[in-house]
């Protein structure tokens, strides 16, 4: 058990680094010239992050479907944005290693019901007003989200975390099966499962508490 915990701690330490390198990919050094490119895409209500970047999401009617990329000028062509069938996919156009500390992708959308990270990214949304929301983190990185919602589903199966304590939800379904953690807020009902090495922490003093734990992870109330 001690060995498993040590592995988990080491992996989480690697996740905290802003410059994750993938073996076999060429390294592209960042230039010192920072530029901003703006893209107008089809409207979307789901966002899928697959690349390596810092992503900020803003709920906005005026700039709905707009994506802004601020990065070193030689990094601009390395990113691609595709919006189709209500889903925005953020990915790298080439298989390269880059330094993401000076890369910021700002996404504007009227509504958001799904947020997915399968890359190596930090994704943040401070204030979201929606009826339902699904957040899945299966990559290496973290998702931070706040706002209000009726029903929220949180799934962490990768190496990272979902921080949703500031997402004031009525009902939360949370599942942790990887090496990571989920923090959340539920005022009516929490349905939580931990089957990995990670942890689930919840606030809001929900009226109904259904929690299940297998493995060496933990579940606790904040």
Where are these regions (language model features)?
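Intrinsically disordered, low-complexity terminal regions
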Residues: 1-157, 161-222
């Amino acid at each position: 058990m001690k060995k498993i915990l040590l592995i988990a701690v080491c992996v989480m330490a690697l996740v905290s680094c802003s410059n994750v390198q993938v073996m076999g990919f060429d390294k592209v050094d960042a230039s010192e010239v920072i530029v901003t490119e703006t893209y107008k895409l089809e409207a979307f209500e789901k966002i899928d992050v697959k690349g390596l970047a810092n992503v900020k999401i803003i709920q906005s009617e005026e700039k709905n479907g707009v994506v802004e990329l601020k990065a070193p000028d030689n990094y601009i062509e390395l990113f691609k944005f595709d919006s189709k069938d209500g889903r925005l996919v953020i990915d790298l156009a080439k298989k390269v290693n880059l330094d993401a500390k000076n890369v910021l992708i700002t996404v504007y959308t009227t509504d958001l019901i799904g947020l997915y990270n399968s890359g190596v990214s930090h994704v943040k949304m401070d204030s979201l007003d929606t009826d339902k929301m699904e957040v899945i983190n299966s990559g290496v990185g973290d998702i931070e989200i706040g706002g209000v919602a009726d029903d929220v589903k949180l799934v962490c199966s990768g190496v990272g975390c979902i921080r949703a304590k500031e997402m004031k939800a009525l009902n939360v379904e949370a599942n942790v099966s990887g090496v990571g953690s989920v923090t959340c807020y539920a005022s009516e009902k929490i349905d939580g499962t931990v089957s990995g090495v990670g942890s689930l922490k919840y606030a809001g003093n929900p009226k109904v508490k259904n929690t299940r734990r297998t493995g060496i992870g933990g579940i606790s109330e904040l």
